[in-house]
Design a protein with these regions (language model features):
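Domain-level signature for soluble enzymes in the chorismate/prephenate branch of the shikimate pathway
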Residues: 1-237
Length: 237
């Protein structure tokens, strides 16, 4: 039975994460054949999961430690401790609109649609963050007060403000405007994909990178805390 359960991300930061693990523990087995990875240290049990899931699973105690993105820690509002910024997987969360739309910032976007009395439609994988960011804007508050933007998914519809609608994206978010939505809330590395889809950035919301997070109860357990400290030392290099 491993002392520490460790969740690592599948997807865009998977390759960089495995390189880091190889530097720290030398011997790794199981990659590509299974979601359960073996390190040279038998006291660490490793499983590969989607980064979106890791903050919540760490919070719930399914895992003691995990690697995920700052963006997903914020999106899930998980009650966990960030131990280390790994400084890879760097992306920016942005709001982008079609180049033909004559607005230059989020305030201008909200004012434009409010003046025309048209619902503003946004596509995003980050429903919580998108809603909170729009609600924090002064133009939003001026027109809609404390109303929550309407969040629309295939199985859920919440929020009172039908004039600002956030649609859950399952990927290829940049392809949605202008036919399906008016704006997107997405992550970028270089911005090339946005330009290829005739989109322009009007707001940079946050910068994100891969981080090591831990369950708070695990950090209060002496044996786990000592093992986690050893892991962090190895990950720092």
């Amino acid at each position: 039975m491993p002392t520490v359960k460790f969740a690592i991300p599948k997807g865009s930061i998977e390759e960089a994460t495995f390189k880091l693990l190889e530097q720290a523990w030398q011997s790794i087995s199981g990659r590509g054949r299974t979601y359960r990875i073996k390190l040279s240290d038998p006291e660490i049990g490793v499983k590969v999961l989607r980064p979106q899931e890791i903050p919540t699973y760490v919070q719930e105690g399914f895992y003691d430690v995990g690697i995920t993105g700052k963006d997903w820690v914020r999106e899930t509002k998980a009650d966990i401790t960030t131990l280390l910024d790994l400084e890879y997987g760097k992306v920016k969360q942005v709001i982008a609109v079609p180049e033909t739309l004559a607005v230059e910032d989020l305030t201008g976007l909200i004012e434009e649609f409010a003046a025309k009395k048209r619902p503003l439609r946004i596509s995003s994988e980050y429903l919580t963050t998108t809603s909170a960011h729009f609600k924090s804007n002064q133009a939003y508050q001026k027109h809609f007060g404390e109303l929550d933007p309407m969040i629309i998914t295939p199985w859920l519809r919440v929020g009172e403000n039908k004039n600002v609608q956030i649609f859950l994206s399952f990927g290829a978010t940049e392809a949605k405007p202008p036919e399906d939505v008016d704006a997107i809330f997405d992550i970028i590395e270089t911005g090339t994909t946005l330009a290829q889809n005739n989109l322009k950035i009007i707001d940079i919301v946050m910068e994100s990178s891969a981080v090591v997070v831990a369950n708070k109860s695990s950090l209060r357990n002496t044996k786990k805390r000592e093992k986690i400290a050893d892991m962090i030392a190895l990950l720092r290099g």
